A protein has these predicted regions:
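Extreme N-terminal starter segment of soluble prokaryotic enzymes
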Residues: 1-5
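N-terminal Rossmann NAD(P)H-binding glycine-rich loop of SDR-like oxidoreductase domains
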Residues: 6-19
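N-terminal Rossmann-like NAD(P) cofactor-binding module of classical short-chain dehydrogenase/reductase
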Residues: 39-40
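Rossmann-fold NAD(P)-binding glycine/threonine-rich loop
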Residues: 46-53, 66-88, 94-106
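Proline-centered loop/turn at the N-terminus of a beta-strand
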Residues: 61, 85-87, 117
């Protein structure tokens, strides 16, 4: 059985992951970080920074879906990734990854012929506005357009 520690377990994604894990006999959620096989982080940037240090100390791989990470936290992730397996994605949706691939292709074929803007709408309880996905797409457009 794979032991998962969910950092941010009371949030929307953390609750969803917890429900999925509880419905699967191959995984178990643990409250004890040191007994975890993997840490899944959907928390807040300040909490992500702390959990990275704990994972380094105990050599625990990570999946990070927290958004709004600043340069300092991203640098910590980069350093930790040299020691630990880390998956970092602001959005885990297959559709978003397909959208990003399509945007890259479109921009390459239509450089200097279009102007882009991003508008997003969320539920009232959305904590990170603009979303990590919107920021990622904005950066992708800027990077591909140069």
């Amino acid at each position: 059985m794979i032991e998962l520690y969910i950092n941010g377990s009371s949030g929307r994604m953390g609750t969803t992951i917890n429900d999925l894990v509880n419905a699967n006999d191959e995984f178990n959620v643990t409250d004890n970080l040191t007994s975890a096989d993997v840490v899944i982080d959907f928390s807040h940037p300040s909490s992500t920074k702390k959990i990275i240090n704990s994972c380094l100390k105990h050599n625990i791989p990570m999946v990070i879906g927290t958004t709004g990470l600043n340069k300092d936290v991203l640098e910590n992730i980069d350093i930790a990734s040299k020691t630990l397996p880390i998956v970092l994605a602001a959005n885990m949706s297959i559709g978003v990854h397909q959208l990003k691939d399509s945007l890259k292709s479109f921009i390459k074929k239509n450089k200097n012929r279009v102007n882009c803007s991003i508008e997003e709408t969320h539920h009232l309880k959305k904590l990170d506005k603009p979303s990590g996905t919107a920021i990622e797409i904005e950066n992708l457009i800027k990077d591909e357009d140069t």
